[in-house]
């Protein structure tokens, strides 16, 4: 039997999943996206050349890998075509390597218009979405009115369904939000112009994955965002609109849940967050700015500067529980180089003085929380590009070991730079 490995984020996204997926796909036959949309921003650096993917799985640059967009992903046709065109201009034969589920919900211009209208209306209480229509598209899916890739096979029926839903959403846009209506004919023309390209890539993903598993193929599932942005388990309402956790693999791809063999949690050596929402270890000082600059913490999708802070072990332990993590990959260890001391958040002090070591479930429960820190010596030596575990500074090794002790999960991979080969694989997930 084959082995199925899940790669997902353990924090608020931006942990470095894309690089790790790209690295590990050297052995994989399939790479599957199972949730989210083009709100993801997965950055790959190969031989110094940077590639940012938003919708297409990170395995697309490997000629031996088939990339799959599963049913749990909301798919923006225009965004997919843009990404395909850019990759094809660089010589990547995307259409030979990419497959789609016919059950993918479509993100269309009225979703984007609604997303931005709602954020504008929220004012100071805005969630901080990427403004790309992700939430409204999932909303249509759950309400059973959304259009899917499968609808593109019958263009006449698609046109009728589209007209109904455009009228439905335009009423809200114009009369409630006082925004401009979406042009039905333009949306229809734009989608139909590329419909045949999309339908040509459609397969029965569940059937394909089950057959691949039986044939002993190695399959990797690529998560987007992070555990603490999960619609059910994250810092609600400051979350995304999909299940970013390991449970989303089965529902978002059609793989049977018993067939997940290893779950790799990507954990950044410190914490970051984009947009609004709780962030107990946030640093609004020189150290926070140091982390932002050294880590180049600016969103691959939005360009927004990320909030930065110390590694929150309490939050990461929640990710361990929810995802039943098999191991960690620690990324951006090199960003901590040069700090005299480093801190780990090992508990929270509540407003009433109680000390706890678990995360609240709703955003309101995080208000007034103070982090309880464990302080460790930093290191002056560089870890950037180090490829042997034994050559890391002792203080860095101590930091890694302490994270393992506090979480109960081994760190199987360590990333010391953005390039594919600036990585130490201590235990390969496909062999674990």
Swiss-Prot record:
GTP binds at residues 13-19, 41-43, 306, 332-334, 415-417. Mg(2+) binds at residues 14, 41. Keywords: Cytoplasm, GTP-binding, Ligase, Magnesium, Metal-binding, Nucleotide-binding, Purine biosynthesis. Belongs to the adenylosuccinate synthetase family. Homodimer. Binds 1 Mg(2+) ion per subunit. Substrate binds at residues 300-306. One of its GO terms (cellular component) is cytoplasm. Its cofactor is Mg(2+). Its EC number is 6.3.4.4. InterPro entries: Adenylosuccin_syn_GTP-bd (IPR018220), Adenylosuccin_syn_Lys_AS (IPR033128), Adenylosuccinate_synth_dom1 (IPR042109), Adenylosuccinate_synth_dom2 (IPR042110), Adenylosuccinate_synth_dom3 (IPR042111), Adenylosuccinate_synthetase (IPR001114), P-loop_NTPase (IPR027417). It is found in: Cytoplasm. Pathway: Purine metabolism; AMP biosynthesis via de novo pathway; AMP from IMP: step 1/2. This is Adenylosuccinate synthetase. It catalyses: IMP + L-aspartate + GTP = N(6)-(1,2-dicarboxyethyl)-AMP + GDP + phosphate + 2 H(+). PANTHER family: ADENYLOSUCCINATE SYNTHETASE (PTHR11846:SF0).
